[in-house]
Amino acid sequence: MINFRLYDKQLDMDLDDWSTKEYSKYYDDVHKYALFNESISQVYQSYIDSPDLMDSISDKVIVVENGKLKIAIIIINYYESEKDNKKVLGINPILINPKYINKGYGKQIIQYLIDCKGRIFDMNPDRLYAGIDVDNLRCKHLFESVGFKLVGKTDDNEFLYYELEL
């Protein structure tokens, strides 16, 4: 059974290992698609230092566990859409523990968010959203496989936008 909890800088310092070359063969993908040459604690600190950076109702760094195993980190941006005033839970990014990529955890996590209609912590969204690097075929396949629809892309064609109405 998976469990979602807020990132705790003291408790979760070991997650910084996920961003090292020694940890797994997915080092390049981890940095290209999720961490952008930072550690997880640095990403977390950037949200602490700039709480209004994303113009969100709230932003959360979430640890996903399966029992005692830390299987993923998700950055959640919860905001109100400017186009229709609906509440949106943005998943940006989801980082599966690199030792467990391609083991089905990503799909299990996203399906859980769909099944609970994104109602985690204090959020009650109308839709789920994900911004995905155009080259991240693994992530595009994951979101498409659970029903997300492509709704747009950046002007430079580097990122695709996917949504799922709840």
Residue map of PLM features:
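Active-site acidic-Proline motif in GNAT/NAT acetyltransferases
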Residues: N97-K99, K103, V134-D135
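Conserved acetyl-CoA pyrophosphate-binding loop and the N-cap/start of the following alpha-helix
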Residues: Y100, G104-Y112
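Conserved GNAT acetyl-CoA-binding A-motif
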Residues: R119-I132
